[in-house]
Amino acid sequence: MTPTGPSHHSMAPKRVLPAASQSNMYGNIRSASTTSTTASTSSQALRLLQNAKTSKNADNRIAHAERQGPPSAHPAAMQKPAARVAPSNENRPDPAARQHQHQQQLQQQKATGHDRVLKESQAGNSTTTTMTSTQSKEANKWSLANFDIGRPLGKGKFGNVYLAREKKSKFIVALKVLFKSQLQKAKVEHQLRREIEIQSHLRHDHILRLYGYFYDDTRVYLILEYAARGELYKEMQAQKAGHFDEDRSAVYIYQLAKALLYCHEKKVIHRDIKPENLLLDLKGDLKIADFGWSVHAPSSRRATLCGTLDYLPPEMIEGKTHDEKVDLWSLGVLCYEFLVGKPPFESQGNTETYRKITKVEFTFPKHVSEGARDLICKLLKHNPSHRLSLEGVIAHAWIQEKISQRS
């Protein structure tokens, strides 16, 4: 695929994801209950893989799923979880043994290291791809034949996501299948190329790994780390109060600040931090999952309007250039949404939202503590240079208090 030209971002309605975020169909994966244990989450994942061996090949399984209907062009379709169909009992292993086996698999993947397992399965060939002149050579190291394909886990505008297992190593992954025709129609090939280029080079505990990619005549396949507990946004919605408590919010902000600090050290600006782009792994730890709007900008300030309306900083709305400090603003908005259940500048119309953002006009509900208010106010500064640094976020008294209580 080749880029078709520069990005042209049109402002989306509230809570409607931009094109890059719509491709984050993997974010629909989540456990049946927000209180699921490690064992039940493991068992669920293995059940999704149950019928992989009954297909003649992986392509037939994907083709069958695609025949159920084309991916919806409406972003709301992404919020609908895949239907659960009970697997056949034929040749079904004992549930307790299956659960134990899968739990061991996920733990072994973590202990052994993601890269090592997949690299060994390719007999020494590197699986980490780079967007260089060797793109085709790298991509050809993988094919659909390398994977057992499980059930579809999510559907979005550009394709589907499947739970999958690399045949040789038994390594469990999420396989994002994107339709070239849809990418070309939306003119977002360049965003996909950018996402692959950036995410494949990042190695951090709180950033979802992109192990590699490959493609055929009609589809592009991304081999992604499997985050068993799914999308953080849905986890938040499932809370009785509609938002997280302060202990949990502080832990997530701490983990995200560490990941963003790593990104900024690598000269990567995310530009689209929001709950929908964050996943939870088997242990409940946060993972940044979508880099479609990210840029690698070592020495320049960007002027592109991107991201989600509620999370846009004043400098973007005002048409000014921006740098990595846009992520600091988004972190403040996210912290507020974690604690309140909605973004601080949410309004009935876009014009009013714009006005509130440029005036930094918002209020706190009574239940938000002084410590949390202090952190949010230090991040939501109109002048980017006045925003609290990521090091300051990590060292903030409210964050440290909650982190120490957790440990």
Curated annotation (Swiss-Prot):
PROSITE patterns: PROTEIN_KINASE_ATP, PROTEIN_KINASE_DOM, PROTEIN_KINASE_ST. Belongs to the protein kinase superfamily. Ser/Thr protein kinase family. Cdc2 activity is required for activation. Residues 31-43, 126-136 have a biased composition (Low complexity). It comes from Patiria pectinifera (Starfish). This is Aurora kinase. PANTHER family: SERINE/THREONINE-PROTEIN KINASE IAL-RELATED (PTHR24350). GO terms for cellular component: centrosome; chromosome, centromeric region; cytoplasm; midbody; nucleus; spindle. Keywords: ATP-binding, Cell cycle, Cell division, Centromere, Chromosome, Cytoplasm, Cytoskeleton, Developmental protein, Kinase, Meiosis, Mitosis, Nucleotide-binding, Nucleus, Serine/threonine-protein kinase, Transferase. It catalyses: L-seryl-[protein] + ATP = O-phospho-L-seryl-[protein] + ADP + H(+); L-threonyl-[protein] + ATP = O-phospho-L-threonyl-[protein] + ADP + H(+). Residues 147-399 form the Protein kinase domain. Coiled coil: none annotated. Its EC number is 2.7.11.1. GO terms for molecular function: ATP binding; protein serine kinase activity; protein serine/threonine kinase activity. Serine/threonine protein kinase that contributes to the regulation of cell cycle progression. Involved in meiotic apparatus formation and polar body extrusion. Contributes to Plk1 activation and phosphorylation of histone H3 at 'Ser-10' during meiosis I. Required for accurate progression of early embryonic M phase. Involved in chromosome alignment and cleavage furrow formation during early embryonic cycles. May be involved in mitotic spindle formation and cytokinesis. The active site is at D272 (proton acceptor). ATP binds at K157, K176, L224, E225, Y226, A227, D290. Residues 1-43, 66-137 are annotated as: Disordered. GO terms for biological process: cell division; meiotic cell cycle. It comes from the Eukaryota. It is found in: Cytoplasm, Cytoskeleton, Spindle; Midbody; Cytoplasm, Cytoskeleton, Microtubule organizing center, Centrosome; Nucleus. Pfam families: Pkinase.
